[in-house]
């Protein structure tokens, strides 16, 4: 369907709709209308006048339940329309009646139907229940605990399992548990998991006669070596071309040609050589020393380019040699050790699988994995096995029943699911009936064990022509995106996709063909694609306090402007007024992370698009409304921000959007357990389960449920310093010991009761309050346990209750709640807690209240679901939650926002799959790929098996074996292919405008790397380069650099020529360099901004947001908290209390009420309580105030100044003392280089001196010239270097020691050392400074490793002080301490060498 709503089937779509009697694979590109084609095919099958089928004879398999519901709805709508056109057609009416019984479902729902129908074939109890995922996790962890406990018990003196656990390391057995579960889960994605486990084990049973070259991993190792050699050859060829160019360093040519010949020859032989010969030839690769390229005719740019490329090739090959260097005997020894580890691991997996099956069978439970495997058992004949899919009589029966099997999103199925579909579809030539739709470029669920190779195999095998048993049909037309978006997407992916990275060619068959047909509109978005590149570091001294215009920008693409940053982001904290005129103050750019600045950039761009600028208010452009069939102004709901992952990044964008007054929403699917309201209720449940848990108990007491202050908790702690906190609470309450209290009985003490006691509430102290408004059904406490006010003869009614009575009330309720937990179902207990405390209503009044309430209701729902588990109870529920958190699990936040609200959505790319938006912003493109799975102790691959590092816990050895390197190479290529497909999904969500944003460090250097693509022939980027990508920008920018509109990137790299690719796409490219925070501009006062998320921050509800609201001293508490909370209105950013409330009258903040006996505000005989409270708070001082003035870090030079006794008039720095005494540079008259600048230049030369050959005046002169050419030194700095002094040093005995051991010399070695603060500032109070450290940083000029220790040299270029050893002793002491700490070797000598006088001072300890 086009944008205008006209349904005009393309020839390819018609072919997919009408093709019959063949297995058909429809490769549908993004926006190709595959769902519409699938629905139309079904309708035409149902209404075919010659061969109609019934809905009950179709099997339609979708990827999600939502997709199945949509498919059912579309089919129903089409049938209703057909009935409306032909109301007398009984067959159509019957199909409508059959719709709800039709097999339109996910693969799991179909498997469940098979098991419910044919349960007797498996001796399966028909009353089985499918476990909730939470139950599955809990059962797996419980079973794993039991399996490991038995395994360790069988090895009291150690054994294979203990060895494996020790080799994996980590705290406890968490790493081993995770590994066993991961291997088990992976095996269950295969049709015959036991056969795969056996294959994995047997692959390590290698005899001495087995050639290494025959093992499955060796082919991958060869490919890895080949790619490395190809990359090195490419670098060398580029270096050779630079050297051979006019003005190039021609003297490099001999070396470059020789080195390239070595690599080329090895490339030709790598496929045929056995390992021993290949290893020897790799070890023989050698790079010699380049000749010096001098003279005015040598272009420094070409010289630097040639040298840099050659060094890249050298470093790459030397690293390869180091990784692979081992003989065949060593390889076989590694295989033997790996085999031992794998056999032990597989044994644990088998034991776990058997124990889990037994546990599930005992309770008549199955999980989703069981659904697939049990269904497969029903459908397989007894003689079936790996590679032999022989259908059972049930499978043959279903083949006859289903006239056609239609599969949506075929690229996302796994091997087990594919086997099930093959068994229920017809396989004979005349009656093939499997119809598969998908797009392998959108296969992004490998982490869920989807196998895109299944789609690719059929894609390559099936022909496009008609007549055969199998057929491939391509749907290339894109009905979603404007032509500009389509052209931009094609331009990028045509260059990047390859069989190596992406796993297919992006050729004419894969490219998009624009067919959206948007009507012309001058106000539509143009250009369709924008790119914003931001530098990750900010220049020192920049900030928001200066200019308010945009950061400096360098260049722009066609139609673009040279401008700087824009804004990003949004927030989580519910409602808040936009800051008029930036009242809250603009943050300093140096205080913002790169992600925060990128989020601000995105937010500012959104605000401009929707609201315009002061000069041009209103939306920047219009979008097409598909429902109204007309153009309309852009709104927030038209915009989505897509991120690779949202868990830690979406909150940053939410906050930035809030700063710009932009409503936004993010359904993160995580952060549930971090939500304050969930933490509070879980803490309460933990206390109910076991009150002797200090942290949960303190959390509950401090929470709004009780509302104690930090001072109250401290006073409680003092009541029983040596006991647990609950015992302290009991003693502080002066309460009798309840049945669940600990160890001993204690009568009320003077510290807990009586006037003037430590726990009394005195005027001026933090107000103590408990939730006095919760339902009070308890008997009053006995008179023999009076509160602290009783000793003074004062009553303790209502709001004037003291701490002890509040604690007694809490303890009484806690005992009742514990009794309730033993008698009632868990869900009822939680609901009773909500009802009694009023906490559910309370959080509803906080910012983000709807989300908070949704989270609490979700906890209640999950507790009730948990009750379905046979072994239920509060303890097990809490244990399940804890284990889930330990394994980094999350239940996902509850959804609290409708889809049609006018907000910007922030979501992950995975969640956006299948959706489309008028404006798509893909952000975070500079974020590195997450390849953590490639660096674990064990690698896991379907074909290559289980591959461990070489692990020897006893010897403390861990390193990669050859199979590990080969498997890691294969997994890396597969992971990169997945990331490329994810990027394709992101870019193809856009209908009318696509915006790309990313941040990288050292932008000019990165641009130079990206622009290397300009010197490559052909259109497709070499796979050896795309396989080296570290983030999406490493694909996007090398491709985009070749576009005529990308001048900004080429200018940044300093590249003027190269190979540009003419293309119809139009791009706007803006580069943001350093700079300042973009101006947020003036916001209209009173704007209320809602920004919510399926995530809550860690602020303490009711403390930071509305302190003590539950504890407010308002009279007349109701039975539930909700009735006692007075609503607070927000108007134009100001908080306004309701008329007549005591907040408005007394000016007291909510939740702060006078303690018992305080003077009322109307009492004029003395200071009011409020005045006392204000005075107390103003008089408070921070107990560790001296530490606030300490520096976080010091340099060794700073320390030298502190201890320099020869600087008359100076005194050691004191904390907080101002050290800025130099005049600003712009006020200084320029009198040539300063002594410090001359010293810096000299140190740079000493750092670059070639120590492998004699140091002469001539060699140093050549070095200085080269450093000037490379812009390391300016000519003025080079002229200031004293060559003669350096030559003198190297001619002296000390210099000769450096030259003699030049390979062991380390120069300009930076270090950081943590030093106790009291060591540097002895005058600090001991208590205040306890545990405080200061980071000392420095750079060691020269360190020489000799046989018996280190020789440390510190070069000096200034004057020689009267006593140099005393002047620099503290400085070299820290140098020595750092070296000995870092290298764990002694420093035997320290020398100060003054170059100006050629004087050597040996420093003694």
UniProtKB/Swiss-Prot annotation:
GO terms of molecular function: 3'-5' DNA helicase activity; 3'-5' exonuclease activity; ATP binding; ATP hydrolysis activity; double-stranded DNA binding
InterPro entries membership: AddA, DNA_helicase_UvrD-like_C, DNA_helicase_UvrD/REP, P-loop_NTPase, PDDEXK-like_dom_sf, PDDEXK_AddAB-type, Restrct_endonuc-II-like, UvrD-like_ATP-bd
Region described as Disordered: spans on this chain: 778-797, 1132-1165
KW Isomerase (keyword) present: yes
Biased composition, class Low complexity, residue ranges: 787-796
Domain UvrD-like helicase ATP-binding stretches: 7-482
Keywords: ATP-binding, DNA damage, DNA repair, DNA-binding, Exonuclease, Helicase, Hydrolase, Isomerase, Nuclease, Nucleotide-binding
Cofactors named for this entry: Mg(2+)
Gene3D superfamilies: 3.90.320.10, P-loop containing nucleotide triphosphate hydrolases (3.40.50.300)
Pfam family for this entry, one: UvrD_C
A GO CC term assigned to this protein in UniProt: DNA helicase complex
Listed EC numbers: 3.1.-.-, 5.6.2.4
GO biological process: double-strand break repair via homologous recombination
Binding site for ATP: 28-35
Domain UvrD-like helicase C-terminal per the UniProt entry, residue ranges: 551-914
Catalytic activity: Couples ATP hydrolysis with the unwinding of duplex DNA by translocating in the 3'-5' direction; ATP + H2O = ADP + phosphate + H(+)
Subunit-level organization: Heterodimer of AddA and AddB/RexB.
UniProt similarity note: Belongs to the helicase family. AddA subfamily.
HAMAP family, alphabetized: AddA (MF_01451)
Function description: The heterodimer acts as both an ATP-dependent DNA helicase and an ATP-dependent, dual-direction single-stranded exonuclease. Recognizes the chi site generating a DNA molecule suitable for the initiation of homologous recombination. The AddA nuclease domain is required for chi fragment generation; this subunit has the helicase and 3' -> 5' nuclease activities.
Name of the protein in question: ATP-dependent helicase/nuclease subunit A
């Amino acid at each position: 369907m086009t944008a205008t709503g006209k349904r005009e089937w393309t020839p390819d779509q018609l072919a997919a709709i009408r093709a019959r009697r063949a297995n058909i694979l429809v490769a549908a590109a993004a926006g190709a209308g595959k769902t519409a084609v699938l629905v139309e095919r079904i309708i035409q099958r149902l209404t075919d006048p010659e061969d109609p089928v019934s809905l009950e004879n179709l099997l339609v398999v979708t990827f999600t339940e939502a997709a199945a519901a949509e498919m059912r709805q579309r089919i129903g709508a089409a049938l209703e329309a057909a009935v409306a056109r032909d109301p007398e057609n009984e067959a159509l009416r019957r199909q409508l009646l059959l719709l709800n019984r039709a097999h339109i479902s996910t693969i799991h729902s179909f498997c469940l139907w098979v098991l419910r129908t044919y349960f007797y074939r498996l001796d399966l109890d028909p009353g089985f229940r499918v476990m909730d995922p939470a139950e599955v996790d809990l059962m797996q962890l419980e079973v794993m605990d039991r399996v490991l406990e038995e395994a360790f018990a069988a090895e009291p003196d150690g054994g294979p399992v203990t060895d494996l656990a020790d080799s994996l390391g980590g705290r406890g057995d968490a790493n081993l548990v995770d590994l066993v579960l991961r291997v088990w889960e992976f095996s269950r994605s295969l049709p015959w998991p036991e056969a795969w486990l056996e294959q994995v084990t047997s692959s390590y049973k290698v005899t001495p006669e087995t050639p290494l070259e025959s093992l499955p991993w060796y082919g991958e190792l060869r490919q890895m070596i080949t790619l490395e050699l190809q990359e090195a050859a490419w670098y060398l060829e580029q270096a050779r071309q630079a050297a051979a160019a006019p003005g190039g360093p021609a003297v490099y040519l001999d070396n470059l040609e020789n080195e390239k010949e070595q690599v080329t020859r090895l490339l030709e032989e790598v496929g045929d050589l056995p390992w021993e010969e290949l290893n020897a030839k790799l070890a023989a690769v050698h790079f010699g020393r380049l000749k010096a390229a001098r003279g005015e005719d040598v272009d420094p740019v070409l010289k630097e380019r040639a040298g840099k490329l050659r060094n890249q090739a050298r470093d790459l090959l030397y690293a390869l040699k180091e990784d692979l260097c081992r003989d065949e005997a060593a390889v076989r020894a590694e295989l033997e050790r790996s085999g031992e580890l794998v056999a032990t691991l597989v044994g644990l997996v088998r034991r776990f699988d058997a124990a889990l099956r037994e546990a599930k069978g005992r309770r008549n439970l199955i999980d989703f994995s069981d659904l697939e495997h049990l269904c497969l058992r029903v459908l397989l004949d007894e003689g079936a096995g790996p590679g032999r899919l022989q259908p059972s009589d049930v499978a043959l029966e279903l083949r006859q029943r289903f006239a056609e099997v239609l599969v949506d999103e075929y690229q996302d199925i796994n091997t087990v699911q594919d086997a099930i579909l093959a068994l229920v579809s017809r396989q004979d030539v005349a009656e093939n009936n499997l119809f598969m739709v998908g797009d392998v470029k959108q296969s992004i669920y490998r982490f869920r064990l989807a196998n895109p190779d299944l789609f690719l195999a059929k894609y390559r095998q099936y022909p496009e022509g008609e007549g055969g048993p199998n057929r491939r049909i391509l749907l290339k037309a894109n009905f979603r995106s404007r032509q500009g978006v389509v052209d931009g997407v094609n331009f990028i992916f045509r260059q990047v996709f390859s069989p190596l990275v992406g796993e297919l060619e992006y050729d004419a068959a894969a490219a998009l063909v624009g067919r959206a047909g948007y009507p012309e509109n001058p106000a539509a978005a143009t250009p369709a694609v924008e790119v914003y590149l931001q530098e990750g570091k900010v220049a020192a001294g920049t900030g928001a306090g200066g200019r308010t215009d945009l950061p400096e920008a360098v260049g722009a693409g066609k139609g673009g402007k040279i401008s700087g940053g824009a804004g990003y982001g949004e927030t989580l904290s519910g409602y808040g007024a936009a800051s008029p005129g930036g009242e809250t103050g603009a943050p300093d750019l140096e205080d913002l992370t790169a992600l925060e600045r990128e989020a601000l950039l995105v937010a500012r761009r959104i605000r401009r698009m929707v609201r315009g600028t002061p000069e041009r208010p209103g939306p920047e452009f219009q979008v097409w409304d598909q429902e109204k069939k007309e153009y309309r102004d852009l709104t927030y709901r038209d915009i989505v921000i897509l991120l690779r992952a949202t868990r830690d990044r979406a909150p940053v964008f939410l906050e930035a959007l809030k700063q710009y007054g932009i409503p936004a929403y993010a359904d993160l699917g995580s952060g549930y357990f971090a939500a304050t309201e969930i933490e509070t209720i879980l803490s309460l449940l933990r206390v109910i389960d076991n009150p002797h848990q200090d942290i949960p108990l303190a959390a509950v007491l401090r929470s709004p449920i009780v509302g104690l202050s930090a001072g109250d908790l401290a006073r409680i702690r003092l009541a029983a310093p040596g006991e647990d906190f609950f015992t302290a609470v009991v003693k502080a309450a002066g309460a009798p010991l309840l049945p669940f209290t600990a160890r001993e009985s204690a009568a009320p003490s003077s510290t807990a009761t009586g006037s003037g006691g430590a726990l009394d509430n005195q005027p001026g102290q933090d107000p103590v309050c408990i939730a006095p408004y919760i339902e009070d059904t308890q008997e009053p406490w006995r008179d023999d346990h009076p509160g602290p006010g009783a000793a003074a003869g004062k009553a303790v009614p209502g709001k004037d209750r003291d701490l002890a009575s509040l604690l007694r009330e809490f303890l009484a309720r806690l005992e009742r709640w514990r009794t309730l937990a033993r008698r009632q179902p868990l869900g009822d207990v939680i609901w009773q807690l909500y009802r009694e405390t009023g906490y559910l209503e309370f959080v509803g009044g906080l910012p983000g209240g709807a989300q908070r309430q949704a989270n609490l209701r979700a906890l209640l729902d999950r507790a009730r679901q948990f009750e379905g588990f046979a072994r239920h109870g509060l303890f097990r529920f809490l244990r399940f939650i804890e284990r889930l958190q330990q394994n980094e699990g999350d239940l996902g936040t509850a959804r609290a926002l409708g889809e049609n609200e006018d907000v910007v959505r922030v979501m992950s790319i995975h969640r956006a799959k299948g959706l489309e938006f008028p404006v798509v912003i893909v952000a975070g493109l500079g974020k590195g790929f997450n390849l953590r799975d490639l660096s674990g102790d064990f690698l896991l691959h379907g074909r290559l098996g289980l591959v461990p590092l070489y692990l020897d816990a006893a010897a403390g050895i861990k390193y990669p074996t050859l199979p590990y390197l080969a498997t890691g190479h294969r997994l890396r290529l597969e992971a990169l292919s997945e990331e490329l497909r994810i990027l394709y999904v992101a870019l193809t969500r856009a209908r009318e405008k696509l915006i790309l944003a990313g941040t990288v460090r050292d932008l000019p250097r990165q641009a130079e790397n990206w622009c290397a693509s300009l010197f490559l022939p052909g259109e497709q980027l070499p796979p050896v380069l795309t396989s080296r990508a570290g983030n999406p920008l490493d694909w996007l920018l090398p491709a985009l650099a070749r576009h005529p509109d990308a001048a900004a990137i080429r200018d940044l790299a300093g590249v003027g020529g190269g190979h540009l690719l003419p293309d119809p796409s139009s791009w706007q490219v803006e580069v943001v360099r350093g700079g300042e925070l973009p101006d947020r501009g003036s916001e209209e006062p009173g704007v209320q901004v809602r920004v919510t998320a399926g995530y809550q921050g860690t602020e303490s509800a009711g403390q930071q947001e509305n302190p003590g609201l539950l504890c407010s001293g308002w009279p007349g508490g109701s039975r539930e908290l909700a009735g006692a909370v007075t609503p607070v209105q927000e108007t134009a950013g100001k908080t306004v209390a309701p008329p007549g409330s005591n907040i408005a009258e007394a000016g007291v903040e909510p939740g702060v009420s006078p303690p018992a006996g305080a003077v009322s505000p109307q009492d004029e005989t003395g200071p009011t309580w409020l005045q006392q409270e204000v005075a107390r708070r103003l008089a408070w001082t921070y107990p560790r105030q001296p530490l606030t003035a300490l520096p976080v870090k010091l340099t060794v030079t700073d320390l030298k100044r502190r201890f320099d006794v020869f600087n008359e008039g100076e005194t050691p720095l004191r904390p907080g003392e101002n050290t800025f005494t130099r005049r600003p540079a712009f006020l200084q008259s320029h009198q040539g280089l300063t002594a410090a600048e001359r010293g810096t230049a000299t140190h740079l030369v000493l750092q670059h001196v070639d120590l492998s050959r004699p140091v002469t005046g001539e060699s140093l002169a050549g070095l200085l010239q080269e450093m000037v050419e490379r812009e390391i030194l300016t000519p003025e700095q080079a002229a200031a270097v004293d060559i003669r002094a350096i030559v003198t040093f190297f001619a002296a005995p000390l210099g000769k020691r450096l030259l003699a051991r030049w390979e062991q010399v380390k120069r300009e070695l930076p270090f950081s050392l943590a030093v106790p603060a009291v060591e540097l500032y002895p005058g600090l109070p001991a208590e205040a400074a306890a545990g405080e450290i200061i980071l000392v940083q420095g750079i060691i000029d020269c360190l020489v490793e000799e046989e018996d220790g280190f020789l440390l040299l510190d070069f000096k270029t200034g004057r020689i002080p009267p006593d140099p050893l005393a002047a620099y002793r503290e400085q070299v002491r820290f140098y020595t301490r750092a070296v000995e700490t870092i290298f764990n070797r002694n420093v035997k000598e320290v020398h100060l060498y003054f170059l100006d006088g050629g004087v050597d001072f040996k420093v003694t300890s």
